[in-house]
Every structure is written in structure tokens, then in C-alpha cells.
UniProtKB/Swiss-Prot annotation:
Subunit relationships: F-type ATPases have 2 components, CF(1) - the catalytic core - and CF(0) - the membrane proton channel. CF(1) has five subunits: alpha(3), beta(3), gamma(1), delta(1), epsilon(1). CF(0) has three main subunits: a(1), b(2) and c(9-12). The alpha and beta chains form an alternating ring which encloses part of the gamma chain. CF(1) is attached to CF(0) by a central stalk formed by the gamma and epsilon chains, while a peripheral stalk is formed by the delta and b chains.
Source superkingdom: Bacteria
UniProtKB keywords: ATP synthesis, ATP-binding, Cell membrane, CF(1), Hydrogen ion transport, Ion transport, Membrane, Nucleotide-binding, Translocase, Transport
SUPFAM superfamilies: C-terminal domain of alpha and beta subunits of F1 ATP synthase, N-terminal domain of alpha and beta subunits of F1 ATP synthase, P-loop containing nucleoside triphosphate hydrolases
Binding site for ATP: 169-176
Record-level GO cellular component terms: plasma membrane; proton-transporting ATP synthase complex
Localization of this protein: Cell membrane
Pfam families for the chain: ATP-synt_ab, ATP-synt_ab_C, ATP-synt_ab_N
CDD domains to which the protein is assigned, alphabetical: ATP-synt_F1_alpha_C, ATP-synt_F1_alpha_N, F1-ATPase_alpha_CD
Function as written in the Swiss-Prot or TrEMBL entry: Produces ATP from ADP in the presence of a proton gradient across the membrane. The alpha chain is a regulatory subunit.
GO-annotated molecular function: ADP binding; ATP binding; proton-transporting ATP synthase activity, rotational mechanism
Family, per entry: Belongs to the ATPase alpha/beta chains family.
Official protein name in the record: ATP synthase subunit alpha
Amino acid sequence: MAINAQEISALIKQQIENFKPNFDVTETGVVTYIGDGIARAHGLENVMSGELLNFENGSYGMAQNLESTDVGIIILGDFTDIREGDTIRRTGKIMEVPVGESLIGRVVDPLGRPVDGLGEIHTDKTRPVEAPAPGVMQRKSVSEPLQTGLKAIDALVPIGRGQRELIIGDRQTGKTTIAIDTILNQKDQDMICIYVAIGQKESTVRTQVETLRQYGALDYTIVVTASASQPSPLLFLAPYTGVAMAEEFMYQGKHVLIVYDDLSKQAVAYRELSLLLRRPPGREAFPGDVFYLHSRLLERSAKVSDELGGGSITALPFIETQAGDISAYIATNVISITDGQIFLGDGLFNAGIRPAIDAGSSVSRVGGSAQIKAMKKVAGTLRIDLASYRELEAFTKFGSDLDAATQAKLNRGRRTVEVLKQPVHKPLPVEKQVTILYALTHGFLDTVPVDDIVRFEEEFHTFFDAQHPEILETIRDTKDLPEEAVLDAAITEFLNQSSFQ
């Protein structure tokens, strides 16, 4: 067989021309310190802030402190197998979590991994946990109501879609109950709900999940949980995971309600991380950027413009106070970021007034424009009337004689307090709220004994369901009150048939 030198040289040239180097250049470093969910590594010269890093044992971390000699890293997940001297690699990516429809009805951890024992979550969509909030021109003003089903909120401190409304109060004053009831009331409202449990007992989270399942609310809800037993980095990350999942739906033109229960525990976890990373402590040992921790989270809740789909994220962040002190550091930070707050009073709760909303300290800065016309008409002055009743009630403790006008205000105030009480997990449709508040503000309840108000309301709603469903339908469809004469006649008919005369 003859060897053709030209053919061989042509083949070699072709091979050289088509050669593509197939190798990866990965920047690696060495772990120099490990402990308490924190690692330090040397040798990662070009790492970016917030970049995902891969440890030798398969765990991941996030770069936080970029210093001249080493990098401070928070570890996402188990750090018991990581040792000093282990290799750590850059990934060139930032932290992302799975998002999409397949997460609905599931309970996941802050990394998007299922913890409910129902198998893998199949989705190929991911979103970064840290993302810029919509800009000024990408937003719309809040114009649609978000009905919580709670008379005290929908009448006194209404919430609109795209609003951030802080729920603040001491422990055991009913904050979580308000959130769960609001989620239950979103059934058939074309709303997706995300409940983020931060630093709670696992038994408590289990109870909330079972409540949602029992009332059929898990069909439109995602639960993100970072329990008290998990490392601080996961507690810090949980709210950002929740809002990343919410953004996926918002940019599809859908409406989302997200509950952060509660941000006080996230702030404590962030303080812990910052102190371990040797960042300079400030007031109450919190780092200087603790305001930015919450502002960049809550600014991602918005009602976006029609060009971006017209979707919304409504946020209900919680803050736990100590002895009702709403002037504390984290509390005032979040109050200044949000569009209003609902303050739950310890004294009111213990007096059996539930939900224990303090009308004087609670406000909604944008929700009023989202109220339906009917509710605006019946509840216009209710919050001020209730706050003035509380003041008058304090004066009556001195035992002075009262004139007829003051006595009438006190009588109306006592009945208002009773009407605004509501049992747990029984949200009320807005049309029923409007009818009972109309009866209250137009004096139909002034002669009803205070002790009978709860029974009066039950029979009142039963009567309207059976005898005058068209009135409820009118309010539901037109968002406005029917003719006053029609409503007055229906309420008078009920009073004539009942034993409350």
C-alpha cells in the first residue's frame, strides 16, 4: 500500500483547523474558616457579590463579604461535612429558585425543595432570588380592592391589590389568623397566595398547612417555610424566595397575595449573619443596611402597568412588637416602607375583641381608593367614629354625668365594636359586610341589646340570603348600594319578623 504524503498532510491540516479545545477554566479557592452557617475562603479573586459557590461536599454558598484577602460566604443548607482546607468553586451564577404553576399546593424550603413528602416538583423555570423592583413608570396606582373577608379591615383599613400593608402587634394577638383568613377569602377570586413562614415552630407551620388544606385554600397557595431549627442563612433567604415565586405570576398578568410571617425573625437572622461576618454593628447590634434588607424586598410588591401584564403582588408583612412598642427600630423601618399598618392591641385581644384591631393606630394610605363604592358609603367615617369612641370610653371611667349626644355616641360605639368582631376562619363576602354595616350606621341596631348583636348578625345574614338575595347580588355586581328605600324596607321587614324590636 503506497503512502501518499500529500493526503496525510492534508488530513493533518484539516484536523488542526477543526480542533476545538474542550476544557473548563474554573476559579477555585480554599476554605479557611467554617462555623455557624458561615465560611471564609481564600483564592476567589474575581468572585461577584451574591454569586453562588460550590463546596467540595456538594453544598452551595452565597458570596456576601468581598474582602482584600478572603471572601465571607453564607452556607445554604448543611455545613457539617465542610472542613477547613476543602476546595470551593465559582459557578458564575447567582442564586435562583424554581418557580411556576407546579409549585401551587406544595410546601417548600427556601431553596425551592419540597418538604411535604409529595415527591419532586417538576418545573424547568427558575428566577433569581434577588431581582430589581419595577421602576416608577412600570407601576400603576392601586385601584382594585383585595377583600380580606374581615369587616374590621375591609371597612376601617382597606387593602388594594399591589399594596404593602404591615400587620404589627405583640405575640399571640392574632396576626397569623388574619393572614390565614385573608388567604381563605381568596377562594374563587383569581388570586394566588404565598405564605412565607420564617423562624416558626414546625408544628405551627403544620397546623397552618392543615387549616389551608381543610378549607380548600391549598389549591391556590404555596407555602415557603424556614423553621426555627434551620440555619440563619435559610431564614434570611426565605422572603426573597417567596417574592421570586410571586414575580413569576405577576409578570404573567396574575394577582398574588404574599404573607411574610414574620420579618422580625428575618431581621434577627440577618443580624446574626452580619455579626458572624464581622460587619460593624449599629443600633441594637443590627447592621447598617438592615433598612435595605426589607426595602428591597417590599419594593418588589407592586401593581404593574398594562404593558407588563397588569398583574400585582400584594404584601402583608408581619412585625412582632415587644409590649406594644411600635416605635422600635425594625418596626419603624417597616412602617416607613409600607403603605399603611394594622396595629393589633394586646388589651383588645384579651378583652375578647377579635380581630384586635386598634383603629386609632391603624391606617391604610392607598387602600381607600380601592374600596368599592358601597363600602365607601357605609364605612366612610367608621374608623374616626371608633377611635373617638375609644377616647370617650376612657373618659367615662371617671364617672362624670354624660349628655344625651355623648351617651348616643357611646351606645353606637359599643354596637360598632360588637359588629366588627368576627369568629376565626369565617371570612364574610363584601356584600354581606356592606348590608350589616349599613344597618349599623343608619341606626337600625341602636335599640338591639349589645349582648344580642352577634345573634342579630347571624339571623340578619340568613334572612337576606333567603328573602332578599337580589339585594346582595346588586351590591356584588354593581359594587354600589341599591336604593336606600329598598335596603331600609328589607331591614325593617327583618326587624318586624325578629325578636329584636
